[in-house]
Structure formats: C-alpha cells, structure tokens
Amino acid sequence: MLAKRIIPCLDVTGGRVVKGVNFVELRDAGDPVEIAARYNDQGADELTFLDITATSDGRDLILHIIEAVASQVFIPLTVGGGVRTVEDVRRLLNAGADKTSFNSAALANPQVITDASAKYGAQCIVVAIDAKRRSDEDALLRGAGWDVYSHGGRKNTGLDAVAWAVEMAQRGAGEILLTSMNRDGTKSGFDLELTRAVSDAVSVPVIASGGVGNLDHLADGVQLGGADAVLAASIFHYGEYTVAQAKRHMASRGIPVRL
C-alpha cells in the first residue's frame, strides 16, 4: 500500500502566508520562505503553495517568491493561484515547482487541463476544487450535494463538485485537491462525506483539505474519507503540532506513512 502523504499548505497573499476561516478573516502566519524551509525540515511529504488572491486581483504569477521557496525545499512543491495557461505551467516548472494547480482557469476553459496534461504529463497537473454544500433550499430543487466555487470561493459556478472532479480526471488531471469551504479554518474536521464521494468517483489521488483541527482529523481523512493525502495549514503554522507528530499519530492508527 502506498504511503499516505501529509501536505502543509501555504496560502499566500501580499508575499505573506495567511490563514482564514471559511475563506475570509485572514490572519498573518509569516514569511513563506521561512515557513517552507521549516516544513521541509520537519519531514513534510510535499508542500502546496497557493497565491489566494492572484485570480481575483487579476495578477501574474509571483515567480520570485516561488523561486525562493523552491530553493529551500527538497520535497515536491505544488503551486497554484493565477495559473491560467499551458505557458504558465512551463514558467512555474522552470521556477522550481514540481506540480501546478489549476482552479478558476479550468472552470473557464476545461481544455487547458487536457492540453497541459498532454504536454507536461498528468503527474504535474493538479485541479483544485473549492466545494460548498448546497443549502437546504438548493438541495430541495437540485438534490443534496456540493457546488464548485471559483475566484477564491467568491463565485458559485453551479457545477456539481463530484461530476466536475470526474471530468477533470478524465481530461488528464493527475490529482484532485478538494477543499470543503464549509470546513475551511473551522478546525471541525474534513467534510468526510464530500471527500468520500469524490474519492470513490475518481481513480486519481484525492487530497483532502479544509477543516483540520487535530491529528485524528488527518487520519479520518484517509480512513473514512478515502483520501490519498491530507492537507492542513493552521494546525502546523501556529505550532500546535509538527508534521512529525502528525505522521506518528497516523502510523499509530495503522496508516502507512513515510516516517
């Protein structure tokens, strides 16, 4: 059985790492290069770096920060936020990223996933899905489930999250980064129903994201949600737990991890 991965996430805006609740109320967590180096030393399996306001601000890729982070990190680095084109993938890989994450651009032009995967390989194409559970009123009209949001969680696309994940995997995404907007920053645990629904529907790895408050939540994402990797931010950024503690805890619950 393949080892399950623990992936600290750096949400970056204005050149600083931040963490919010339900995608708002952002709080400063520090310098991205310093934080990335710390996680590298702690034994993180990978790092995810998301420029969370690039798309909504219409900004270009912050390549100088990515180059600085990549120089400190010797584990796979995924970069997302403002990734729009196949050319952007090339620029990020040249800057030191190992994988690139598409979100809003894939919604605007799904063909970009097909093209980027064909050119650079599925292994370096991640599709990030920000999903929110339908309201009770919506569920009465359309059935229970989750909608996909774009532009940093600001815009409901009306697309079903599970169906979108399936389409993205078929188009060549090598991985799905699945965030529950309802759980983001709440520390109440992953939306395991959402995680399981997507994990069961696609054959590519699913990274669970949004809501980790303790180490059992990480293990639950794998054992109950079916995730191949678990992503967390605040529990690591503010020193509540180290990556090594998280790995030991997952191992104690019978989950294969790289210790």
Curated annotation (Swiss-Prot):
Name this polypeptide is given: Imidazole glycerol phosphate synthase subunit HisF
Regions crossing the membrane: none
Function text: IGPS catalyzes the conversion of PRFAR and glutamine to IGP, AICAR and glutamate. The HisF subunit catalyzes the cyclization activity that produces IGP and AICAR from PRFAR using the ammonia provided by the HisH subunit.
Cellular component GO terms held in the UniProt record: cytoplasm
Pathway where it operates: Amino-acid biosynthesis; L-histidine biosynthesis; L-histidine from 5-phospho-alpha-D-ribose 1-diphosphate: step 5/9
Top EC category: lyase
InterPro entries recorded: Aldolase_TIM, His_biosynth, HisF, IGPS_HisA/HisF, RibuloseP-bd_barrel
HAMAP family assigned to the protein according to its UniProt record, in alphabetical order: HisF
GO biological process entries: L-histidine biosynthetic process
Pfam families listed in its UniProt record: His_biosynth (PF00977)
Catalytic residues as annotated in Swiss-Prot or TrEMBL: 11, 130
Record keywords: Amino-acid biosynthesis, Cytoplasm, Histidine biosynthesis, Lyase
EC code: 4.3.2.10
Entry's localization field: Cytoplasm
Keyword ATP-binding: no
Subunit structure, interactors included: Heterodimer of HisH and HisF.
Region forming the signal peptide: none
Family of this protein: Belongs to the HisA/HisF family.
Broad class of where this protein is predominantly found: cytoplasm
Annotated GO MF terms: imidazoleglycerol-phosphate synthase activity; lyase activity
Source lineage: Bacteria, Pseudomonadati, Pseudomonadota, Betaproteobacteria, Burkholderiales
NCBIfam families tied to this protein: hisF
Catalytic activity from the UniProt record: 5-[(5-phospho-1-deoxy-D-ribulos-1-ylimino)methylamino]-1-(5-phospho-beta-D-ribosyl)imidazole-4-carboxamide + L-glutamine = D-erythro-1-(imidazol-4-yl)glycerol 3-phosphate + 5-amino-1-(5-phospho-beta-D-ribosyl)imidazole-4-carboxamide + L-glutamate + H(+)
